[in-house]
Amino acid sequence: MNVQLPIKDAIGAIPTGERPGSRKVYQAGSLFPDIRVPFREVAVHPSANEPPVTIYDPSGPYTDPHAKIDIEQGLERSREPWIIARGDCELVATPREVKPEDNGFAQGKHLAPQFTAKRPIFKGAQGKLVTQLEYARAGIVTAEMEYVAIRENLRREQDRPCVRDGEDFGASIPDFVTPEFVRQEVARGRAIIPANINHGELEPMAIGRNFLVKINANIGNSAVLSTVADEVDKLVWATRWGADTVMDLSTGRNIHNIRDWIIRNSPVPIGTVPIYQALEKVNGVAEDLNWEVFRDTLIEQAEQGVDYFTIHAGVRLPFIPLTAKRVTGIVSRGGSIMAKWCLAHHKENFLYERFEDICEIMRSYDVSFSLGDGLRPGSTADANDEAQFAELRTLGELTKVAWKHGVQVMIEGPGHVAMHKIKANMDEQLKHCHEAPFYTLGPLTTDIAPGYDHITSAIGAAMIGWFGTAMLCYVTPKEHLGLPDRDDVKTGVITYKLAAHAADLAKGHPGAAMWDDAISRARFEFRWEDQFNLGLDPETARAFHDETLPKEAHKTAHFCSMCGPKFCSMKISQEVREFAAGMAPNSIEQGMAEMSDKFREQGSEIYLKTE
């Protein structure tokens, strides 16, 4: 296990500052004037005579040059006043104390430093509304809902026309998102706003079929790698490149302390798989897990501010034999843990049996469910089998139970699925899970490319996002091979941002095409700097261009090294356009008529005889 250094020595330079060619801008609320919703604005060259392009921005204060970043104090808890003003929560008088097992019994130099800055810990007051779902059902528009509405509109005006030429497969995407529309979607369970009342640093966002497709990035330590510094750095790095949520999947020691540092410095929702930490508390012996340990872990993480829990309550005892003839069996870590527990005790999954108790704990802090697909296929050969869909149907049943308790729900999905089987996954989820948001890992469309699974999965992610999946969990090049580093995180995030945007474009999401059109015009007009800055990864685009044309003068040239100055199709197209524009209005028709007359004079023969 790594030696844990003091945070000031270990943290290094957290990536901060604006992205190239961009600036941080904010839009205030109308119902709640104090809210400030962030965007990334990219200005284009004055010759374009175009307004700046507004891009969705989950990077938080780290890209605001005026923000004071202090990792040891955490981000400003700007959402906390909204929670207090509602008057529906109370301070926890005696918060749960940190126990040795919370950090895997790490001691001395191996124990990660605690996050020591003090903060209040809240819990829902008895008989009061607590969750965004409960507020929505009561007809109350919260500050979080207006925040989401502003964010989704990307600063478009309500009466501004938009292009809607996609296929949305029955979704109900509006031309303009209002706070009332957000409320309605949350009330129906078609969207969630994952926002624990103890995550005051959060910038609210929505996950739902009728909103922009979101992406999640996974970080977390393991039994052999990573420190607090590594994980905070990966958090900031992932959000800088566009991660909308981050899951802390830590499985080694120091899980509690590392998670505290992550949440206190996170502007995006944080998700976890509580069974991982519960397993550490019983020394890694799945058979020793029990409700008391798991319940304690839920409360611990809820008080810290985790926004959504992956709970594998659908891995039921009767379903386990259905996996026996699979090529890759049970590949979900959480699913395999619960399957082992069920078989060892020959009992029903205690997460399933105690599900209503879990709901009551999560409701008290407004923690959302991410109902885990513990029986997801781990190979294309196993896709869409009875084990997978039996669990999915159970998750649909549990969704109704969670809604009854006022808890927000999304459903996790596969996995490894060949392209021709992807649509069936979306159809089955909509049918059995009552339109609760779908959250999928890819899916990977082929199993032949270790080291390139970010690509094999992005193919499936773009497709299932188009069909209706609300959030895509990224896959990095290290999938199946090792723990990703920061370069892998960047690659995974950017790959999935383009998959999500491709899905938005295909769905006909209003505003999606504006970004593409802006960069297309820049490309046609040889505005190289605009091309770089409007891209998902300006640094890489600029570096690739400069490998062969490094001089500054080349950034105004009307060609690149692919075609050179004589064969550039866009340059030739511009010349054709200019030539056509200079011709008399009837000259083209006149020329065509002359050629037609000549054709008839020659006997209207397609092939002329030669002497």
UniProtKB/Swiss-Prot annotation:
Q: Which cofactor does it need?
A: [4Fe-4S] cluster
Q: Which reaction does it catalyse?
A: 5-amino-1-(5-phospho-beta-D-ribosyl)imidazole + S-adenosyl-L-methionine = 4-amino-2-methyl-5-(phosphooxymethyl)pyrimidine + CO + 5'-deoxyadenosine + formate + L-methionine + 3 H(+)
Task: Please give the pathway this protein is involved in.
Answer: Cofactor biosynthesis; thiamine diphosphate biosynthesis
Gene3D superfamilies this protein is in? 6.10.250.620, Radical SAM ThiC family, central domain
This protein's record includes keyword Manganese = no
Tell me the Pfam families matching this sequence: ThiC-associated (PF13667), ThiC_Rad_SAM (PF01964)
Q: What does the record give as EC number?
A: 4.1.99.17
Q: Which UniProt keywords apply?
A: 4Fe-4S, Iron, Iron-sulfur, Lyase, Metal-binding, S-adenosyl-L-methionine, Thiamine biosynthesis, Zinc
Record carries keyword NAD: no
At the top of the EC hierarchy, this enzyme's class is: lyase
Molecular functions (GO terms): 4 iron, 4 sulfur cluster binding; carbon-carbon lyase activity; zinc ion binding
Look up the record and report any one GO term of the cellular component aspect: cytosol
Q: Which GO terms describe its biological process?
A: thiamine biosynthetic process; thiamine diphosphate biosynthetic process
The UniProt record gives the binding positions of substrate as 218, 247, 276, 312, 332-334, 373-376, 412, 439
Residues at which Zn(2+) binds = 416, 480
Comment on bound cofactor = Binds 1 [4Fe-4S] cluster per subunit. The cluster is coordinated with 3 cysteines and an exchangeable S-adenosyl-L-methionine.
Q: How does it assemble?
A: Homodimer.
Query: What function is annotated for this protein?
Result: Catalyzes the synthesis of the hydroxymethylpyrimidine phosphate (HMP-P) moiety of thiamine from aminoimidazole ribotide (AIR) in a radical S-adenosyl-L-methionine (SAM)-dependent reaction.
Identify this protein by name. Phosphomethylpyrimidine synthase
What lineage is this protein's organism placed in?
Bacteria, Pseudomonadati, Pseudomonadota, Alphaproteobacteria, Caulobacterales
